[in-house]
């Protein structure tokens, strides 16, 4: 359908040359305005869904060798101080004003922007709320932002590795944490742990090292499950980032501790390939 509508609309819409959501919550736009726009004083990006409208400023300027151009960066999400968009599809348009005259232009997206590959990449979700936004287009080629349901998650905020202690700060997203608590879970063992709120929305887990000594002097892996107080438990992970090689970038030092009298244990906090947070515990006398 795009192949039918787009040729007939060229010259009457603002053509997006760049459109991307890089940090999971900011829409970056660069567009070429139609030739009939020869002057402009102010401009705004308009997000529309049904009767709801949200406006954010845009920059328009003349190109020395071509049509007028537009740049805009639109932050999404009330929690981030941005546009309070909710679930649904929000159509994007550009309103240009000059004196008392104004014109509203559809923002046409012919091809989605392909981000460059590098050490970082586009984020699929907002780092603050885990809300998922994506750029799409209608059958007529109009650009739109699609806001979908938040998937509940437990996200690592910080890991404090000390001489003989490890604390983990975490956030619970997408579900209300009424009275959260955590469990560290190995193959055949579970240890319940309290969580203390150290900042609004940030909870701290004091890792129970004395309960995590490997049985039989072997090696054990412990995952962390967070119980938000309602709903299913959430596996603690770190996924809200733009790093392409997180296991290499987010490495943490291993420490040798004596959680019990006469017992040595080597413990290493780490991330799995899927981003799950895990502790690898081994006998301190045998581990390298």
What do the PLM-derived regions correspond to, one by one?
Residues 1-288:
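Basic, ligand-binding patches in group-transfer machinery
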